[in-house]
Amino acid sequence: MTFKKILVGSALLLTTIFNNNVYAKDKKLELINVSYDPTRELYVEYNKLFTKYWKDKKGQDVVIQQSHGGSGKQARSVIDGLKADIVTLALAYDIDAIAEKASLLSPEWQKKLPHNSSPYTSTIVFLVKKGNPKHIKDWNDLVKTDVSVITPNPKTSGGARWNYLAAWAYALEHNNKDEEKAKEFIGKLYKNVKILDTGARGSTVTFTQRGIGDVLIAWENEALLSLHQPGGDKFEIVNPSLSVLAEPPVAVIDKNAAKKGTTEIAKAYLEQLYSKDAQEIIAKFYYRPSDLEVAKKYANTFPKIKLVDINYFGGWKQAQKKHFDDNGLFDQIYK
C-alpha cells in the first residue's frame, strides 16, 4: 500500500472488525485512538490483533477509530474536545499538555505503564536520494548552502521537535556547549528548509512523492518504511553521528473513557502493546520494540547510533518553553 493511497480521504481512519456471532447482550464497544502522523500502518495492523484478543477474552466486538496528524496538533484537538479514549503521541509534552490544560488525565500518567509509558522508541535519521548525490554524512552537511532540507513544522509536529533537538544536540556537542553557536547552526539549517509540512507523513510525501528537497530529516521508522514502499529503491538512509532517543508515549484519557464506559478496554488496548505479538508488529513497522527479546531478534534492523535522551535538554517542559513556545528559539531563527 502506498503513502498516496493511505493519505486519500479523511485523516480519520476507521478500522472495523466484525464477528457474525455477536452476543445480543453485549453492546459493541468503540474506541478512538488519537495518534501522531506516521503510525497509520502500525495501528491498522495492531488493531486487528487487539480486536481478536478482546473478542476471544470478552466475547465483544470492537470498533476502533484512528485519527492521525502532527502530534502537537492532535493534542490540541483533544484539549479542544475530540473525545479520544486513548492517545498514542510522539512525545510526552503533548500528553502533559492534555493533562495540564484540559485536566483529562492524571499528571502522573507516565508512571502507569512500563518504560515511561513508551511501548516503542525510535530515533531521527536522514533519507537521501540513491547514491547520495549531495554527499550528506552528518548534520553539518545540512547547513551547506546548496542543500535543500525537508522537515515538518515543530509548532505542529512531534517528529519535527525531535528533529530540531537532534540537530541542537549535535551543534552543542561540536561547539563546546556554546548555545549562541548552536543557535547560529540551527538558523543555517532552517534557512535551507523551504517547506514546513504540518506532520511527518506530509514531509515524507513531499520528499519521496513530490521530489522536493535533497534530504529528509525523518523518524527512523518512517525512513525504513519508505525504502519498502514502491519506488523505495530510489532512496537510501544516512545515520548521523549523533541523534536522539525518541520515546513516543501512550495514555488513557481517563475522563473521556470514564464517561464513555471504555476505561477497561482502553487500559487493555495500551497494555497489550507490550505483549510479544504486538512487539513483533512494532518491529515489523520499524519501531524499536521495548521488549528485550524481540529487540534482540531484530537487532540487525536497527543500527547503533549515539543517542541523547530528553534529559539532555532538561526534560520536555524546559525544552518546549525554550525552543518551541511562542517567541522561543525556533520563532527567533525561523521567520
PLM segments and residue spans:
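Ligand-binding pocket segment of bilobal, Venus flytrap-like solute-binding proteins
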Residues: 174-241
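Extracellular/periplasmic juxtamembrane helices and adjacent flexible linkers that interface
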Residues: 257-335
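Short beta-strand->loop
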Residues: 34-36, 128-130, 148-175, 190-193, ...
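N-terminal segment of the mature folded domain
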Residues: 25-156, 299, 334
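Short helix-loop capping/hinge motifs at secondary-structure junctions, enriched
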Residues: 131-137, 156, 169-177, 256-264
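A bilobed periplasmic-binding-protein/Venus flytrap-type ligand-binding module shared by bacterial periplasmic
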Residues: 124-132, 247-264, 281-285
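Bacterial N-terminal signal peptides that target proteins for export
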Residues: 1-8
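C-terminal segment of classical bacterial N-terminal signal peptides
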Residues: 15-23
